[in-house]
Amino acid sequence: MDTTQRLLQLTSPALPVGAYSYSEGLEWLVDQGTIDNESHLRTWLLQELAYGSIRMEAAVMVRGYRASTDVQILQYWNAWLSAARETEELRLQSLQMGRSLLRLSKALQDPEHTGPELIEVWEQLQTGCNFAIAFGLTANLWQIPLESATLGYLHSWATNLISAGIKLIPLGQTTGQQLLFQLQPHIEAATQSILLLEDKDLCSCGWGLALASMAHETQYSRLFRS
C-alpha cells in the first residue's frame, strides 16, 4: 500500500488531537505587538526552525520512530522530552495531543496485527505520552518512511502556527498560504539536519518561546488554550 495517504492522514489539520487549539505563545506575542505582520511571523517561524524547541521535538520523534516497540527506549525519550519542556503550558499541550494520538492509533490498529510488544507500549505510555513520541510510534506502525514522517511533523507544526497567525494578527488566507509555500525549502533543510542529529546534539535555544508561553498562561483574554 502507498503510505502517502497515511502520511496525509497523520499530518492532516483534521486529525483529532486538538492542535488547532494551541498557539505556542504566539497569541501573547501578537497581543504585545511583537508579531503584527507576515514578515514578523515568517521571521519567528524561521528562527524556531533553526534554533527552537521544534527541532528538539522532531529529533525526539525520530528516536521514537526508531525505537518502534522498545518500551524502555520510548519511556526514556518520553521522560527526556517532558523534562525539556520549558513551561507547564507546553508540557500539557504535548501530553494532551500525545494522549489523543495514542488513543486514535489504537482505534485504527488492526487487532490481527497487534502483537504483545505493541500492547505493552500502549499500556506503559497511556498515563502520559508526549505528542512527538506518539507521532513517531504511529508513523512507524503505519510504515511511513522516516524522512517523510519528519518532514510531515515539521510541516504540520508550521501549518498550525500559520493558521493561528491568520486568526490573531490577522492575515489573509492567501497570505498564509504564500508564507507556508515560502517556508517549504526551510522545512526540507531542517528535516535533513534533524535526521543527522546525534543524541549529544539535542538542544534548543527557545527562551523567547518559553517567555511567551509563560506569559500566555496568565494572559487575560485568549482565543487559544493554555
From Swiss-Prot:
Q: Which GO terms describe its cellular component?
A: cytoplasm
Q: This protein's superkingdom?
A: Bacteria
Taken from the record, one Pfam family name reads UreF
UniProt keywords (A-Z) are: Chaperone, Cytoplasm, Nickel insertion
Q: Which Gene3D superfamilies match?
A: Urease accessory protein UreF (1.10.4190.10)
Where does this protein chiefly localize?
Answer: cytoplasm
Q: Which family does it belong to?
A: Belongs to the UreF family.
Name-wise, this protein is: Urease accessory protein UreF
Q: Which organism is it from?
A: Acaryochloris marina (strain MBIC 11017)
Q: Which gene encodes it?
A: ureF
